Amino acid sequence: MSVRQESVGQATAARSRARAVAPPEIREHRIPTQGSKPYIAMEGFDGGLWFCESGTSKIGRFDPKRASFTEFAIPTPNATPIGITVGGDGNYWFAEKTGNKIGRVTPRGEFTEFALPTPNAGPDGILLGPDGNVWFSETEVSRIGRITPDGTITEFKDGITPGGKPLSFSQRDGALWFSEAAGNCIGRIAMDGTVTEFPIPSHDSQPRATIAHPDGSIWFVETSTNALGRVDRAGKIVEYKVTTPNASLRGVAVGPDGDLWFTENFANKIGRMAPDGGMLGEYEIPTPASGARCITAMSNGRLYFTQWDAGLIGEVIPR
């Protein structure tokens, strides 16, 4: 499949003039347990924000209406949970990077854990697939795993760049798309395990978070090259520079307005980009050096992001 080789500079010059937007309000909520190091977060079945506490081996839930937290301790100590997703069974599934397990937790906080067949696989990203199974990345061994609701695990390695370090997933066209942080590409895995890779034009871009856009494209952050990338339906990749140099982009989400909202770890800002690549703004996070990581949009029209270093959940209210 062909890949559009358009540089970051070309894409920046080609974008339309960005529209004027009002800055959002940013609020912060402190997680009760000190040293929680929140990582991936997503909206649950109940309208709460469910997230992994990588520093304290817990699964957290934030109630947006009451601004309150509930925390559930994972049975395995020092499991380092990273990714979390809703399952087709009404439960939540998560990846234990150090524990080398896939965990399942009910809405009431009851846990089941499944050990991975490959030692030190380093499971990271995780997402419910269109086939009803949960898929996850095995970052340290460059494989993609699949777990059925009853706990049967299958691993796929063919077609993935050796040492590519797959990370984040998004769903499109009946398949899952994923980033390869060391492989410098975006991958696509069909439900039969067939993998296709799409090289990113910029060298050593370190793609991380991905998100599916309603227009059918897949967006991703490039941590090393300070840009957002876009994969269209034909597999062509275009990259768009962000304004602040060396911002260290980590998470990306599609807001209720269709814009791309993203976290800037080093710059300690929340960025906003139009779907045509035009920068709309960058907004300071109140807490300095907060360690902004994942950002996710919720059905209440707001976005929430994790602050790994500060132990906070950030709330973005677009205006």
Roles of regions detected by a PLM:
Residues 58-61, 100-103, 142-145, 184-187, ...:
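A short loop-to-beta-strand structural motif that recurs across blades of beta-propeller domains
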Residues 27-31, 70-74, 111-116, 153-158, ...:
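A short beta-strand motif characteristic of beta-propeller blades
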Residues 291-319:
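Blade-level signature of beta-propeller repeat domains, shared across WD40, Kelch, NHL, RCC1
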Residues 34-46, 77-89, 119-131, 161-173, ...:
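Beta-rich, blade/repeat-based domains predominating
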Residues 51-55, 92-98, 134-140, 178-182, ...:
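Conserved beta-strand positions in repeat-built beta-propeller and related beta-rich domains
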Residues 63-67, 105-110, 147-152, 189-194, ...:
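Short loop/turn segments that connect beta-strands within beta-propeller blades
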